[in-house]
Amino acid sequence: MYLEKINGPEDVKKIKIDELPVLAQEIRDALLVRASKHGGHFGPNFGMVEATIALHYVFESPKDKIVYDVSHQSYPHKMLTGRKEAYLSEQHYDDVSGYTNPNESEHDFFTVGHTSTSVSLAAGLAKARDLKGENGNVIAVIGDGSLSGGEALEGLDFAAELQSNFIIIVNDNDMSIAENHGGLYQNLALLRKTDGQAECNLFKAMGLDYVYVDRGNDVAALIKAFKEVKDSTKPVVVHINTLKGKGYAPAEKCKEQWHYSGPFDIETGKPLFDNVEVDYSSVTCEYLLEKMKNDSSVVAITSGTPTVMGFTEDKRKEAGSQFVDVGIAEETAVALASGIAVNGGKPFYGVYSSFVQRTFDQVSQDVCINNSPITMVIYQGSVYGMNDVTHLGFQDIPMLSNIPNLVYLAPATKEEYLAMLDWSMEQTSYPVAIKLPGGPMISDGSRVTKDFGRLNRYEVVQTGEKIAIIGLGTFFELAKEAAKLLKEEAGINATVINPYYITGLDEALLTKLKQNHDTVITLEDGILDGGFGEKIARFYGASNMKVMNYGLKKEFLDRYDVDAVLKENHLTAEQIAEDVLSIL
């Protein structure tokens, strides 16, 4: 095997060009076995094997700096830069992250995981090189799906001003996570159709030189093209036409499904663990499709992640023009929603918590200053959500809850969520965001009659004394568990409160608690700094009420164990009960 002997890029260069396809197959074989057991990003890596080999064959990493956009396609890169054991040995599968990481290797320059950043990051490396009078190639590798992001276009626009070595590899597989959306993809299609010869050329129009490689999975053709642009003295785009999922028939056939995979059977491609349980994504999709049938003004919006809202390909077709995918462009998604709302439409935008920071300016400026009645639903905004350092989901409360005019809600159950949607989609007074709870969806079958238009009215679900526990969203169940333990272990009958509202205080209820309570506990599924609990603590201020805030520390966690993090932050019922008893 060639792969077993590769400890760095210098070993790739020792292989004859006509033998490199053998190495490519070995890489795919290793990726296939690992993915079948461990899961991970599948299609992007299978499509980039030859390009990665060619990059390390031609360039001199790490002197020549390669920056991968998103970096979810960096598995072959890791295999060729001293980390092959993490893909060949099951015992070492967890030794590396799913994205580039400078702590792992000198061949990785940034910890990244979001789209459309590579060109700007690499341009910065090139600018610093020029200022220091150094040499070396700087290469940005970006997939066509990422070109729909504004930062990518901003980076391309700036790149032309460098007037020095800067190479941009556009990996064009005619796909984002799902299908591509937007006018620029018509130009990419035209360039593919004309073998890169079309007069209308996005990249040339931006002042960049341009090279087209039709056979983007032919390692010899790629090596030839990369040698042509190596040590170039001005910015150049190398547009390579690749096949997402290449080398595994099920992935080639169903590219969207195989963007990312869990463990599966190699022979059939079928998942080892069927996820048949109903979740918030499927509930959302069915709710919106039903509303669309009776109301043509309802619009579901996604920014390149349609399945976050349950909109698989068949559901998107069913929704027709009432479903909009703006591409990986969160800013546009929010501004579009505001425009739709102002003109009488009923926009719904679903987004992962990890991408909320990309929406902040538009939520603040385009939505909340204008008081546009949009509905924005936050998915996986929880310690139970994604656990890569680039995809954390517990920072949205401080971001969103402090924007004026926004009503930020936190349901604890499916029934509460649907009731909030019923109110939000029909009201025209406020912009509304809804933070879905983490973990398995809870459905208690209850009928929720609460009028959410009467803002900031909490609900007391258990009346007690001395101790009041306010459990927000995900942690409402934890509040009930802690109260139960206090009753069982110390005979304390605690008050339990479901606050519903992240953005406002029920001052009347909080004031009333002073009559027969001396301690208030807040629980939130997010970082404490600037969060929900601090607002409660500030309300009680100089009074005699003790306030204990429970949530997460402000830190970047990476590939963490949920139970360990909860325990470290005293977010277990046993620890909360113990803390309460220690101060009585």
Identify the role of each PLM range.
Residues 1-79, 215:
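N-terminal amphipathic, basic-rich helices that act as targeting or association modules
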Residues 263, 269-274, 385-387, 407, ...:
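Peripheral docking tails and interdomain loops at the edges
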Residues 39-48, 67-72, 101-120, 142-146, ...:
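Active-site nucleophile and cofactor-binding loops and adjacent substrate-binding regions
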Residues 29-36, 95-111, 133-139, 312-327, ...:
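Glycine/charged-rich beta-loop-alpha catalytic/anionic-binding loops adjacent to active sites
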Residues 41-162, 298, 303, 312-313, ...:
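Cofactor-binding active-site loop characterized by glycine-rich and histidine/acidic residues
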Residues 73, 108-264, 270-277, 282, ...:
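Glycine-rich ThDP/TPP pyrophosphate-binding loop and its adjacent helix/strand module
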